Structures are given as structure tokens and as C-alpha cells.
């Protein structure tokens, strides 16, 4: 009886240890991916019909060929070398991600993108499409009405207004899974955990925490990315074990702060704790104005010459007033950005200054360009 009480106490203590988080700890499930448990990309080609004159134009030949092939499957024979000119049809590519573990009969969302020169997919219907994996096998069938978030309006004069992207749409639950992708998750004796942010310290902390929770030799850190875990072979026991595994609290260690910016959109994201060493910053604003005009040369009426036009370019470069900003050591980057903004700098200027600070060794952070 006393042995049973001790066993119960052990399970209670283990449960409390798994539930109660430590300082700055995170659940293991948010830090790692399980090797072999991942999504797979699917792709297909088909036609969207029912468009209100916004489909592919005559110069897109493969749309007419696809339409003729489809009609032939339904017993409709077109004359040879006849190009069906239809404005209500668009050739499209279909893409989707098959989540891990999905089986036959389940539905997934799909994205429909125009391949030709269609103006809009709004109001169209996707015809039955086979979605294939990288191995060429068919894993899903797609069909349905396309939902488009963008719109394009065009007047008789040729002027047009476009909001968002009308040539890309989605079909929620538009594909039905017909074949499940096999996984080796239940086959191997070990489960491999891949860290989302590789770090030797984080990998070691994961192994130590799992060994404390489930016993010695349960987990072994293989590298800065991989941690090998011994798991039960029985399917039910393995699922229960993995559910406990995901809730184990891990001290991932301090991650190096990051500065991320997108050069295309001008977006700048600064992580917490980014510091700057002592530096002096000077950034000149350059404005380039280029004006193009054509000069007409009219010859003498009796000279027999021809009237010609010659292009003339007027380029003007204006340099703004430079200001030198002194940055003391230990300054938070947020303060520097506020100072730069007060000088009227654009996001492009901020990105240029951050790159210069990084190259000068004055930025204590990882610089990521996307």
C-alpha cells in the first residue's frame, strides 16, 4: 500500500513539474518541429470558367488548346486547327498544402492563380482538377467557386483602377484528399526534434529537460539543430508520449536580437534588446529629377529635308542638408530610429543607415533582409 502511495506522489510531482513553467521558459512544442511530420505541397493545372469577359485573350494559345481537349473528353469534336476564342475562360495554376496526417475525405484550402493574361478571376468557377505531389501522384481533387479579394475596373478610354490582385483567388475547402501521404513517424524507434532556431545551448537544454522529465537517456542532442528522443513503439503510447513532450517547459536561452527589413516594401522590424555601440551617422538625402522632352527640328520648306524629333533629357540632382548624429555606446536602436525619423528620413534611409551601422560593427544584432 505504501508503495502505491509513493508511486502516486511521483506521478503528481511529475505532472506539476511539467505544468508549472520556469522563468523565461517556453513549451517545447513552440520551439521544435518533429522530423517527418510536415506538410506537402500540391500543384495542378486547370481552367476557370464563367468569367464576365475578363478571361484570357486570343494570344494565349494554351487556353484554347486546354478548352478543346476538355470538350473532346465530353464527346464534343471541334474542327481541326480551330482555335476556340472564348473570353470567359482563364488558364490557372492551383496550389495547396496537404497538412501532415490528413486522410481521405478531408478538405483543404486551395489557391487559384492566373497563368495567362486574364484581367480578373472574380465570379469564376474552377473545373475539376487533379492536384499532384512532387512524385507525380494524384493526392487531391479540386473544384469550386473562386473567391477573389481584388477587383479591376476599366473604362472605354482604357483607363483602369485595380484594387489588390484580382487574378489570384482562393477556394476554402476546395480540394478533397484522395490519398494519404505516408509518414515514417510510427516506424522509427526514435523521434527527431528539429529546433526552429538552431542553437547548441537550446539543443542541450532540450535534452536535459527531457531527461529530467522522462528519465535518463531519453533524449540526446545530436547537433545545434537535432535532438534524438527515444519514444514508445505502440501507436497510442507514442501519441500520449508526444502530447506530454510538447508541454515540457524549456529554457531556450537568450536569442540574439534581430533587425529585419523588407527592401521591397520598406518595412523595418526591430527586435527587443537591440543595442548600438558608439558611432557617428551622417546620411545625405539625394533627390534625382529626370525630365524627358522631344524637340522638333523643322527644315527649310525649300530645302527638301525631313522633319525629325530629337530627345532631350534634363537631369537634376539635389542634395539635402547633411546632419551628423552622434550615437553614444549602449543606446537602444529604438531611440536612434526615433532620432532618424525626426530628421525626416524615409524607411529606405533607415535601412541604409542600419546596414552601414552593421558593417561598421556598431550594431549588436543580426541583420536579416527579406
From Swiss-Prot:
InterPro entries membership: Flag_FlgI
Any single Pfam family the record assigns to this protein: FlgI
The UniProt record lists the keyword Magnesium: no
GO BP, sorted A to Z: bacterial-type flagellum-dependent cell motility
Cellular localization per UniProt: Periplasm; Bacterial flagellum basal body
Biological role stated in the UniProt entry: Assembles around the rod to form the L-ring and probably protects the motor/basal body from shearing forces during rotation.
Family of this protein: Belongs to the FlgI family.
Subunit structure: The basal body constitutes a major portion of the flagellar organelle and consists of four rings (L,P,S, and M) mounted on a central rod.
Protein's recorded name: Flagellar P-ring protein 2
Organism of provenance: Yersinia pseudotuberculosis serotype I (strain IP32953)
Amino acid at each position: 500500500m505504501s508503495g502505491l502511495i509513493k508511486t502516486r506522489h511521483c506521478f503528481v510531482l511529475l505532472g506539476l513539474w511539467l505544468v508549472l513553467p520556469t522563468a523565461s521558459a517556453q513549451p517545447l512544442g513552440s520551439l521544435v518541429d518533429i522530423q517527418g511530420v510536415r506538410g506537402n505541397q500540391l500543384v495542378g493545372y486547370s481552367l476557370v470558367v464563367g468569367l464576365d469577359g475578363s478571361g484570357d485573350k486570343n494570344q494565349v494559345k494554351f487556353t484554347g488548346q486546354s478548352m478543346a481537349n476538355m470538350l473532346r473528353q465530353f464527346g464534343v469534336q471541334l474542327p481541326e486547327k480551330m482555335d476556340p476564342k472564348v473570353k470567359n475562360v482563364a488558364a490557372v495554376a492551383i496550389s495547396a498544402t496537404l497538412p501532415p496526417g490528413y486522410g481521405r475525405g478531408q478538405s483543404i484550402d486551395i489557391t487559384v492563380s492566373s497563368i495567362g493574361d486574364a484581367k480578373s478571376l472574380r465570379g469564376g468557377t474552377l473545373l475539376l482538377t487533379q492536384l499532384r505531389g512532387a512524385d507525380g501522384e494524384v493526392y487531391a481533387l479540386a473544384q469550386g467557386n473562386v473567391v477573389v479579394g481584388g477587383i479591376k475596373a476599366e473604362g472605354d478610354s482604357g483607363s483602369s483602377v485595380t484594387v489588390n490582385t484580382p487574378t489570384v483567388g482562393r477556394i476554402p475547402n476546395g480540394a478533397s484528399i484522395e490519398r494519404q501521404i505516408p509518414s515514417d513517424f510510427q516506424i522509427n524507434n526514435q523521434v527527431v526534434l528539429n529546433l526552429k532556431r538552431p542553437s547548441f545551448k537550446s539543443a542541450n537544454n532540450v535534452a536535459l529537460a527531457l531527461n529530467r522529465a522522462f528519465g535518463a537517456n531519453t533524449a540526446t542532442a545530436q547537433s545545434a539543430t537535432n535532438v534524438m528522443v527515444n519514444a514508445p513503439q505502440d501507436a497510442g503510447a507514442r501519441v500520449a508520449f508526444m502530447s506530454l513532450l510538447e508541454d515540457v517547459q524549456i529554457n531556450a536561452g537568450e536569442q540574439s536580437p534581430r533587425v529585419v527589413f523588407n527592401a521591397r516594401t520598406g518595412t523595418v522590424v526591430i527586435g527587443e534588446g537591440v543595442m548600438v555601440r558608439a558611432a557617428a551617422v551622417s546620411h545625405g538625402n539625394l533627390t534625382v529629377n529626370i525630365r524627358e522632352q522631344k524637340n522638333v527640328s523643322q527644315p527649310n520648306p525649300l530645302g527638301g529635308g525631313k522633319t525629325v524629333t530629337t530627345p532631350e533629357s534634363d537631369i537634376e540632382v539635389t542634395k539635402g542638408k547633411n546632419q551628423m548624429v552622434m550615437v553614444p555606446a549602449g543606446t537602444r536602436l529604438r531611440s536612434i530610429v526615433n532620432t532618424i525619423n525626426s530628421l525626416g528620413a524615409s524607411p529606405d534611409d533607415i535601412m541604409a543607415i542600419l546596414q552601414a551601422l552593421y558593417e561598421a560593427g556598431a550594431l549588436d544584432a543580426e541583420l536579416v533582409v527579406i
